[in-house]
Amino acid sequence: MRYISDLHEGDQVSEIYLCKTKSPGTSKFGKSYYSLTLQDKTGMIDGKVWELTNAIGHFEAMDYILVRGQVTSYQGSNQLNIQQIRKAQEGEFDMADYMPSTKKDIDGMFKELLAMISKTKNQYLKQLAEKIFIEDKNFAREFKVHSAAKSVHHGYIGGLLEHSLSVAKICESYANLYPQLNRDLIVMCALWHDMGKVEELSSFPENDYTDEGQLVGHIVMGAIKLDRLIREIPGFPPKLANEVKHCMLAHHGELEFGSPKKPALLEAIALSQADNLDAKMETFAEIMEEQKEDQEWSGFQRLLDTRIRKTSI
């Protein structure tokens, strides 16, 4: 199979890809065309069908399609100029080739998560973590393979677990550096800070926002679930319950970034910084992975609000 990550400008392509999105458009000359997003397990590529001829068969978004065309460059990124399309038939493709996945061992990461829970001394936080990640086996199974985003960072199978574990590790290092931070509170809140994404985003291959995800969002969805689980634990201290929910509600840091509350606890401040750091590190890494070998600087990156390049050493 010719993977998207291996495509270069000028390449002729005849391959089956998953059509994630299909949008009709009209050029400035009044001609109709299609904009597509094509995906395999190595990434995505923008596709353009400029000529809607008989060579373009009927297909819809989320179909597997055989495309023929040429790779061009547009604003520093690869784009596929498509001349022919037909819907792929069963047996012509293996779905595993089209599901992007973490490079890390999922079971190994989940064992690390469980080890963090076992180290927790606060009985209420430990019980809450066990309810989420151990007792609710359906949730745990989904959490392990879910993505953390539709497209921004960790948008692949195992991405949610990878991101949550990384944020928890950063928070653990913060707690070691700053003794005024409560380790149990910040690390446990890091592990479950994005738990709402299991319901906010649908599973692969769609990996798109659900109706509840669009209307409510993962932060509020996670806080609602936390509140319900906390009420099931006898004697859970009300102040601690509020602190747990606050860390969830404030983990995006700023109101304009989607947080219903700004951080008002040390642990909430540190968690929001750790979350932002890991997201930006992964975003940077994913951009660099897609960068052409002969390209030093990237194009303007809206998510980072600047152009970027790798360091020289």
Where are each of the predicted segments found?
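OB-fold nucleic-acid-binding modules
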Residues: M1-V13
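Divalent metal-dependent catalytic cores for phosphoryl transfer on phosphate-bearing substrates
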Residues: S151-H153, E162, S173-Q291
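Divalent metal-coordination and catalytic microenvironments
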Residues: Y17, M62, V167, M248, ...
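Acidic/His-rich, divalent-metal-binding segments that scaffold phosphate/diphosphate chemistry
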Residues: E92-Q214, E254
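OB-fold single-stranded nucleic acid-binding module
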Residues: K22-S32, G43-D97
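N-terminal intrinsically disordered, cationic/polar leader segments
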Residues: S272, E290, D294-I313
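Short, acidic/hydrophobic/Gly-rich beta-strand patch recurrent on exposed beta strands
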Residues: S35-D40, S203
